[in-house]
């Protein structure tokens, strides 16, 4: 799927179209084996003890995640892991003051998903929510974004590397990461408190053969730019503002029909 965003060309990578609550779409994992496929079958039939206390909203959210997540995630992580993440997402939506302001489309694509890049998935949503919920309590949404980024800066500093992107909790444990890891970490932290967020990446600047990744977060009807773990007093301010305005290609990931 391709979308044009001013001032740069912006590509959102997604799976084929299907509605969030649509029950007739073909199941992507129906031919696969293992806990993930078994659980998806149980979601459709209601035949499992795991679903005794699941709500209709949680069921729909799980169907969306399983429909669009990478196949490796279906087989690598347990159904309980995804259910815990779904429940924490809805808890944040209920308890954070901006929860009711986030449109369903944005919640579905930029809060609910766990994956940001090619990192291993972990329990960061639950951990980050417990640590951040009181810190941003009572704040306006834009102020909360800035505060979360301050918190991220306290946890992680920049260090270049060429390895695979580390998981958010692994980044916290090491206390450092490159821009791709810092932005993955910051997106995970923002999503943990119910703020729509996405990683934005340019593979090459106009002025040099180098790349960069940063964060966009949504508040009050608009997307705002911020440098991950690089706190500023306001949004839409970063050292990369000028080169980003001249970048020819930027992309992000959006799982589902967005």
Feature locations, PLM:
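Catalytic beta-strand/loop cores that center a nucleophilic Ser/Cys/Thr
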Residues: 177
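General secretory precursor processing signal
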Residues: 16-17, 182
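Secondary-structure boundary elements
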Residues: 27-174
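Boundary at the C-terminal end of the N-terminal hydrophobic targeting segment
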Residues: 17-23
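Prokaryotic Sec-type signal peptides and long signal-anchor helices
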Residues: 14-15, 43
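Hydrophobic/aromatic-rich core segments of domains that either
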Residues: 22, 130, 134-135, 139, ...
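Sec-dependent N-terminal signal peptides
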Residues: 4-13
């Amino acid at each position: 799927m391709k979308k044009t965003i001013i001032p740069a060309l912006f590509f959102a990578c997604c799976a084929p179209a299907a509605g969030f609550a649509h029950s007739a779409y073909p199941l992507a994992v129906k031919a696969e084996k293992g806990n993930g496929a078994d659980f998806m079958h149980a979601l459709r039939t209601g035949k499992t003890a795991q679903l005794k206390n699941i709500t209709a909203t949680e069921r729909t959210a799980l169907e969306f995640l399983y429909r669009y997540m990478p196949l490796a995630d279906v087989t690598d992580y347990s159904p309980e892991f995804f259910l815990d993440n779904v429940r924490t997402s809805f808890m944040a939506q209920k308890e954070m003051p901006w929860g009711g302001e986030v449109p369903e489309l944005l919640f579905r694509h930029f809060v609910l998903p766990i994956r940001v890049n090619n990192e291993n998935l972990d329990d960061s949503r639950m951990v980050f929510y417990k640590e951040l919920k009181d810190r941003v309590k009572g704040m306006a949404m834009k102020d909360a974004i800035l505060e979360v980024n301050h918190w991220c800066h306290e946890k992680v500093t920049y260090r270049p590397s060429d390895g695979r992107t580390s998981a958010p909790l692994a980044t916290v444990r090491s206390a450092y990461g490159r821009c791709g890891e810092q932005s993955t970490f910051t997106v995970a932290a923002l999503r943990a408190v119910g703020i729509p967020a996405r990683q934005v990446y340019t593979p090459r600047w106009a002025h040099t053969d180098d790349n960069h990744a940063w964060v966009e977060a949504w508040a009050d009807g608009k997307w705002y730019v911020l440098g991950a773990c690089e706190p500023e007093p306001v949004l839409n301010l970063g050292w990369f503002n000028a080169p980003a305005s001249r970048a020819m290609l930027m992309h992000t990931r959006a799982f589902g029909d967005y």
